Structures are given as C-alpha cells and as structure tokens.
Swiss-Prot record:
CDD domains cross-referenced by the UniProt entry: S-AdoMet_synt (cd18079)
InterPro entries: ADOMET_SYNTHASE_CS, S-AdoMet_synt_C, S-AdoMet_synt_central, S-AdoMet_synt_N, S-AdoMet_synthetase, S-AdoMet_synthetase_sfam
One GO CC annotation: cytoplasm
One GO-annotated biological process of the protein: one-carbon metabolic process
Pathway: Amino-acid biosynthesis; S-adenosyl-L-methionine biosynthesis; S-adenosyl-L-methionine from L-methionine: step 1/1
Function, in words: Catalyzes the formation of S-adenosylmethionine from methionine and ATP. The reaction comprises two steps that are both catalyzed by the same enzyme: formation of S-adenosylmethionine (AdoMet) and triphosphate, and subsequent hydrolysis of the triphosphate.
Gene3D superfamilies documented for this protein: 3.30.300.10
Pfam families in the cross-refs: S-AdoMet_synt_C (PF02773), S-AdoMet_synt_M (PF02772), S-AdoMet_synt_N (PF00438)
Name this polypeptide is given: S-adenosylmethionine synthase 1
Organism expressing this protein natively: Hordeum vulgare
Length: 394
C-alpha cells in the first residue's frame, strides 16, 4: 500500500507589497540608528496608503537621523518612483511622529543604560519559536523557501529588465505534496504554484504567464518537483495594474509568517522589523532559530521546534522547550539539556553573541524575503553551533 501523503502551502510577498515596504522602512530606520549609536532603543512602526508614508513609535538614540530621507530612499530603492507604479518616493507625503522610549520601560530593561549585558532584562514578556527541518539545505521548509525565492526572483527580473512589464507589488504561494516519514517531512512534488504580480498596462495575460514560467518558475523550482499534473495559477485575477500603497494600505508587522517559517512550526505573535535587540520578539526568535538549526545540523533530530518565553525586566528566560516531533536520535529532554548548555538566552548576551547592535544595511536585508534560511554573513543566527552528543548511546 502506498504511503499516505498530504498537501501543505506557504505564501510570500515581495518587497513592493505595501506591508513589506513598511517593514523595510522600519528596519532602515533601525539600521540608521544603530550605525551611529549601537545602544539605540528603537521601536519604529510604519504605515502607508496612497501618496503617504508615516513613521511613528519610540526611539531613544544619540544618532542624528533624517527620517524623511530614509523613507524616500527606501521607497525609491524598491522601485516606487511614480504614481503609476503605486507610490512616488520623491513626491509622496512623509509624516513622522517619533517619541522617546518610556522611562518606565528603560529603567526596568536596561537601567537607563547602567546594567551590564548579562543583567539586561527582556524588553517585554512574550513567547518565541525557532524551527528547523532537514528537507532543504537551508534546514527550512521547502514550501516557504520556494515561495520566498519566487518572490525574490520576481524582483530580480523586474530590476534587471528581463521582464520590463513588471511592477513592484507581488505575491507568491506554493503547495507541496509531502510524506510524513516518522515525524520528518519529505517533499514529494510541487502540487500548485500561484503567482500574482503587479504589471503595466501593455502586457497581455498570455505574455505574463509565459514570462513567469520561463524567467521566474523555471530558475527557482527544481525540475524534479514539477510534473505534468502541477497546477499553475499565474495572475488568476486577470488584472493587477494598481498595486503598492495605491492598491492596499500597508503596515509594519503584518507578514510575520512570511518572515519566519511559512506556517510550519509555531509563532509567538511578535514581529521583528523596527525593533532593536532588547526586544525579545526579535532577538529571542533569532536565538531560537539558531538553536533549532543547530539541533538538526548536529544530527540530533530531523525536525524540531524550540520555544522560549520571557518576562519584562527579567534576563533569564522563564522556560525553554524542545520538541523533535519523534525524530530525535536521543530523548528530547537530553536535547533540551544540550541546548541550555550551549546557548545563552539572556537578551544582553544574545545581542553580543549574535552581534545584533550592528546597523548599516544589516536589518533592512531581513525585512524582505525572510529572516531565516539566508546565506549571508549578517544573518549571524544562521551559523550552526555544533552540539556534541554520545552517538554510541543514541
């Protein structure tokens, strides 16, 4: 009897989606603050709608930051250079409403900058998850990796002129048929590919479909996963000329599943972009990913999830949890012991060990195409820590 398979789907959006535009602006502000003042405390939100971008939040920094310039530069880099494509970076309204971090939070978390790194408390309560799986070289879910890479490829062929009819906004979605092999996920085939991309007035739907298959899908999805039964929905609505902030309002923190694992594992609900590393929504999720990835890379399990939790002002996590979905070579309690011995989950130490005070153009790179599974030296949480265990007893 054939093994039973199931379908699972992940989606992504590319950098011209209004929510992702906002994530990128928020992280561009964070980068600018950290570049001048590594101790900046940043909680920067962004929203956008037709002809308007607003940044607001709480920022305490010694940096001199031109918020309006950051907004316009970020929108321009994405490709929003005229009203026709959804936003004109040089002529849109830019609103700024930034205040300082609450002194109540400041004294509880970092003692107004007097606490040593190991004493720095979590910036808030919350739960964070890290996930890893052996189904791809990146130790990430294949559905998520393919959906994300399709979005990145859409942007690449737009910017290099291969598909000149493309505009910045776009969404992707990939459904894969999986086999559950004792708790491990084994991709069998790609069942459905969905791409909805903004386009100009001149291109036909047939041209869109042909170009997407040739220049986007073919370079991204390995041929071994495609067959004559694979379903393609390419701009199924029939028309997507109006896009970006002109088509939909955008807001920071609305694409948290796209930022992480595409619906696999779990999510604690906290977003990443626009937050400095004292915000454990970000730093906690990063160290949890490093722990989960290290478990898989060290051969301790084929798939796993790590959860950590915090209280505001308290350095040590309240709890650490590991589940290997039955794929562990040793019991989960022993994997958990190794994790606790090898990873320091205190926010101040996460910041040092993952070098999270470095700005520049570091965090804006995370704000589109996922925070995990990226091959980039700035993604320090993707570096595997070898976890040694007694293979003889496994």
């Amino acid at each position: 009897m054939a093994a039973e398979t199931f379908l699972f789907t992940s989606e992504s959006v590319n950098e011209g989606h209004p929510d992702k535009l906002c994530d990128q602006v928020s992280d561009a502000v964070l980068d600018a603050c950290l570049a001048q003042d590594p101790d900046s405390k940043v909680a920067c939100e962004t929203c956008t709608k037709t002809n308007m971008v607003m940044v607001f939040g709480e920022i305490t920094t010694k940096a001199t930051v031109d918020y309006e310039k950051i907004v316009r530069d970020t929108c321009r880099d994405i490709g929003f250079i005229s009203d026709d494509v959804g936003l004109d970076a040089d002529h849109c309204k830019v609103l700024v409403n930034i205040e300082q971090q609450s002194p109540d939070i400041a004294q509880g978390v970092h003692g107004h900058f007097t606490k040593r790194p190991e004493e720095v408390g979590a910036g808030d309560q919350g739960i964070m998850f890290g996930y890893a799986t052996d189904e791809t070289p990146e130790l990430m879910p294949l559905t998520h990796m393919l959906a994300t890479k399709l979005g990145a490829r859409l942007t690449e062929v737009r910017k290099n002129g291969t598909c000149a009819w493309l505009r910045p906004d776009g969404k992707t979605q990939v459904t894969i048929e999986y086999l559950n092999e004792g708790g491990a996920m084994v991709p069998v085939r790609v069942h459905t590919v969905l791409i909805s991309t903004q386009h100009d007035e001149t291109v036909t739907n047939d041209e869109i479909a042909a170009d997407l298959k040739e220049h986007v899908i073919k370079p991204v999805i390995p041929g071994k996963y495609l067959d004559e039964n694979t379903i393609f929905h390419l701009n199924p609505s029939g028309r997507f000329v109006i896009g970006g902030p002109h088509g939909d309002a955008g807001l920071t923190a609305r694409k948290i599943i796209i930022d992480t694992y595409g619906g696999w594992g779990a999510h604690g609900g906290g977003a990443f972009s626009g937050k400095d590393p004292t915000k454990v929504d970000r730093s906690g999720a990063y160290i949890a990913r490093q722990a989960a990835k290290s478990i898989i890379a060290s051969g301790l399990a084929r798939r796993c999830i790590v959860q950590i939790s915090y209280a505001i002002g308290v350095p040590e996590p309240l709890s650490v949890f590991v589940d290997s979905y039955g794929t562990g070579k040793i019991p989960d309690r022993e994997i958990l012991k190794l994790v606790k011995e090898n990873f320091d989950f205190r926010p101040g130490m996460i910041t040092i060990n993952l070098d999270l005070k470095k700005g520049g153009n570091r965090f804006i790179k995370t704000a589109a195409y996922g925070h995990f599974g990226r091959d980039d030296a700035d993604f320090t949480w993707e570096v595997v820590k070898p976890l040694k265990f007694d293979k003889a007893s496994a």
